[in-house]
Every structure is written in structure tokens, then in C-alpha cells.
Amino acid sequence: MFKFNKKKLPSRHTSLGPDKAPQRSFYYAMNLTERDVAKPFVGVVTTWNEAAPCNIALMRQAQSVKKGVKTSGGTPREFCTITVTDGIAMGHEGMKSSLISRDVIADSTELTVRGHCYDALVGVAGCDKSLPGLMMAMVRLNVPSVFIYGGSILPGRFNGKDVTVVDVFEGVGKHSSGKMTAHALRKLELKACPTAGACGGQFTANTMACVSEAIGLALPYSAGTPAPYEQR
């Protein structure tokens, strides 16, 4: 009746046989059809939150991922996990949460996929610890997986030049040494980060995005497209 034979897939434990009728009832409650339940379940995880621009576009990107999964014959199952953004956390007690968050991301993603017997995983992340966190989970799970970088932020314009958050950091130093007025610093901070996306510099997010391609978890040339672009 259906295209896919799930007898050897992990999701058989939650969708095949008379004894799985209760689980299937839950799926039908979420408007899945019998045909949907008979297809491979593909987890779509993002680290979306409103903590910083790094992650703010990820939920929208996930909807495109889900369309792709459906087109390819799978049934997408979206979920989110936490992230701690270094750009907000650093310089105070919050930075103690940063590295730990990487392992929480990996652990929570792994637990969700194992707990619900998903057959494959697509992960979308946008900041320093979330990229390696999702990639760690993919390696542990050993199921078909694809990593997608949320993309870098676009530069802003200030005094006729491209600027990024790096210039704001430097501006803080200039202000502290008396080389920039408070008014100029305020104008700079208002212009430096005009869009969604990860920090516009060769920091951990953009670096790990390159690594994701190099180790084969991301598709070639997928990391370079900025977050606001429709191609992303």
C-alpha cells in the first residue's frame, strides 16, 4: 500500500503492528495520516530562540527543511533545543553556561531522537556552541543526518563603511580610552547588526560552519549563504 517498508527502521518501534495502536493514535491527533505514519520519521531540530540574532531565523528555515523532507518522501517531526549565545553571555556570570550548553544541546537532541525512534535527523543551528552540539548528537546517533548552518549576519553601514559587531567591540575600547564619544558609540551600535544571523566575523559559528562541510555533515557550499537570503 505504501512506498516505504519500515520493518528495519527505528520508527517501527512506534508505528508498526497492532500493539502500536496507542502511539499511532497520538500521531493522528497531530493531523498525521496513515500514509504519513507509514513513512520514515525525520527529526528536524533547531536551536531557535530570541536570545540573539544568531538563532532568530532558524524556525523559518526549519519550515523549508520540513517541505524538503516531505518532498523526499519522509515525515518531518520538528523540535527545538536550548542554546546559550556567547555574544550575550560573555563578560559576566552567564559565560559559565556557554560550554556546558554545547553538551546539553547534544544530549537533548540525542535523547529526543532516541526516545521517539526517529529514522534520520536534520539539524539547523546558528551560534557558537549550538553548531558543535548538534554535530556531536549526529555522530552519537549514527542515523542519516544533515547539518545546516543558519547563516551569518550581513554587515551594517556606518560613516560610509561596512561594520560588524567587531567594530562595536573595538568601539568600546576606543570609548574607554577617550578616542570615541558616547554618542558615536551609540550610533555605531545601532547600525552594526542590521539583520538576523551569526556574528559577522571568523568566530566559532562561521568557523564551525566551514568544519561542518569539511567533515561531510553539511552539503558542499551550504555554509556561505547569509541568514537573510532566501537561498538560505
PLM regions: where:
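Active-site cavity-forming subdomains of large catalytic enzyme subunits
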Residues: 98-232
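Long, structured ligand/cofactor-binding scaffold of large enzymes
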Residues: 35-149
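Flexible, glycine/charged-enriched surface loops at secondary-structure junctions
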Residues: 9-13, 34-38, 73-81, 182-188, ...
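N-terminal amphipathic/basic leader segments beginning at the initiator methionine
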Residues: 1-36, 71
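Gly-rich Lys/Arg/Thr-decorated short loops/hinges at beta-loop-alpha junctions or inter-strand turns
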Residues: 3-11, 42-49, 82-96, 189-194, ...
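A short N-terminal beta->alpha junction/helix N-cap motif
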Residues: 10, 14, 32, 49-57, ...
